[in-house]
Each structure stands twice: as C-alpha cells, then as structure tokens.
Amino acid sequence: MAATTAPNPLAAYRFLLRATRIAFQGDFTTLHAARAEARKQFDQHRQQGVDTPMRIQHAMETAEILRTNVVQGVKISGDGEEADRYASILVMRRFRGEYEGEDERREKEREARGGCELRIHEHIERGDNDSIKTAGKNERVKVAVGKACSNTQ
C-alpha cells in the first residue's frame, strides 16, 4: 500500500504568499496586509492539531481564489490619469473578459467620464456566461415510482 502524504504547511504558506504577490501586485498596502494576515493565521495554528489538514486545505483554496478571482482596479480620473487605488474586486468565477478587445471609441468614452482600469493578469479565470444561461435548461430524468433511482425511463 502506498502511504498518503500529509499536506505540507510550508508549501501551503508559500503558495499563499505567491498568490498574494500575483493578486496585489503594485498595491503595497494591500499586499502587506494580506501577507501579515496569512502570517498571523499560520503563527496562531503553529502546533499540529486534528484540524491541521483542514486548515492547510483552506489556505490552498484561499490562494487559488486570490490567483484566479481577485482583480486589482485603478480609478481613472477625467483627464486619464490614475487617481488612487481602491479595494480589490472579487469577480464572478465566470469572468466574461469584456475589458479585453474593446474598441477605441468605448475606451475613450470611459476615460473621458472617469472610470476604472482593471489589472487582469494571465491567471484570472475567464469564461463566458453561456454555461450559466443554460444551467437550468437540462432535461429532467423521469424516475418511475416504486423503482430505485438508478432505474430511469
């Protein structure tokens, strides 16, 4: 029998730090706060416990969300210059990618009225909403009364 290896806390911590670097690149304040929180959580639970694998799994999932779903935004003033950074935006898992490939006219209009510019990096999960639109339209399977669920008609 092959022995299962326990999740490595150090690897999870490093993965989380890398994810914060990717998600909060260019925003030192948020990057520092996220890393301080990660350090605090790992220091509080330094001793091995029954829930250690669960906490490591939580750290890995948090890192994955930071890498794939958090986008930094920069507020653009009316004259096209950066005004100030604002809080990160948690985007939907099926991000449409509509900020890529906009025509110049729409881009100029958005800058003229003051908008925001998103730093969308290569790790951001993109998709279309087609799967969401068709989610409730699956054919329903009819099960005969009195038969096991595996027997369908």
Curated annotation (Swiss-Prot):
GO cellular component: mitochondrial matrix
Keyword ATP-binding (UniProt): no
Single GO biological process annotation from the record: mitochondrial respiratory chain complex III assembly
Keyword hit for Mitochondrion: yes
Main localization of the protein described in the UniProt heading: mitochondrion
Keywords: Chaperone, Mitochondrion, Transit peptide
Subcellular location: Mitochondrion matrix
Transit peptide: 1-56
Disulfide bonds: none
GO MF term list: protein folding chaperone
Family of this protein: Belongs to the complex I LYR family. MZM1 subfamily.
Function: Assembly factor required for Rieske Fe-S protein RIP1 incorporation into the cytochrome b-c1 (CIII) complex. Functions as a chaperone, binding to this subunit within the mitochondrial matrix and stabilizing it prior to its translocation and insertion into the late CIII dimeric intermediate within the mitochondrial inner membrane. Modulates the mitochondrial matrix zinc pool.
Quaternary structure, from the entry: Interacts with RIP1.
Protein name: Mitochondrial zinc maintenance protein 1, mitochondrial
Organism of this sequence: Ajellomyces capsulatus (strain NAm1 / WU24)
